[in-house]
């Protein structure tokens, strides 16, 4: 009989470089996280702005070009994207956000990068323990998790980092409830 084989303990997996995106037609927040042990490191965070006076097609182009620059510089392995959230009160907002999401999905596909969608409540619950956390609570949770000296501003950037963190932690779980887009 052969002696028992001892297998090494399973190593936690990490999702590689994650690009978190908070889509918007006026401002699209983004955050790039890279693995570093159990806690990721923030490599870059910012806002891609479109010019409100331009035609819709030009604004979408501006978002796409800005996002392509981020892809070229950081080569993310996954995009974590906030799902569309809309109440019946503001259908126009959801429609405008859909244009930004469309170009985000296009740029990700062009760069052969999978996109995973997360509902806002899912992100809030994972980071703060409450699906009803406010913007300030999200900013503080992101600051703490990434060990930043200051909170990330504006909210679009903090939200993008929160979405990336949600993916970073969810991707390590056996049953990730996220939706591949």
Task: Show where each model-derived region lies.
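Phosphate- and other anionic-substrate recognition elements at nucleic-acid/protein interfaces
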Residues: 1-181
């Amino acid at each position: 009989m052969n002696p028992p084989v001892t297998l090494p303990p399973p190593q936690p997996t990490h999702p590689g470089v994650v690009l978190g995106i908070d889509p918007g037609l006026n401002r699209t927040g983004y955050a790039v996280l890279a693995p570093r042990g159990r806690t990721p490191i923030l490599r870059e965070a910012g806002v891609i702005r479109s010019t409100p006076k331009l035609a819709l097609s030009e604004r979408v182009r501006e978002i796409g070009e800005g996002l392509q620059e981020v892809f070229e510089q950081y080569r993310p392995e996954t995009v974590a994207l906030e799902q569309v959230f809309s109440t019946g009160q503001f259908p126009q907002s959801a429609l405008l956000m859909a244009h930004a999401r469309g170009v985000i999905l296009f740029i990700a596909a062009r760069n052969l990068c999978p996109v995973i969608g997360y509902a806002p409540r899912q992100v809030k619950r994972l980071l703060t323990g409450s699906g009803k956390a406010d913007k300030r609570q999200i900013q503080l949770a992101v600051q703490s998790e990434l060990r930043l000296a200051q909170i990330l501003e504006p909210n679009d950037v903090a939200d993008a980092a929160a979405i990336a963190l949600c993916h970073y932690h969810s991707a390590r779980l056996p049953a990730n409830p996220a939706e591949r887009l």
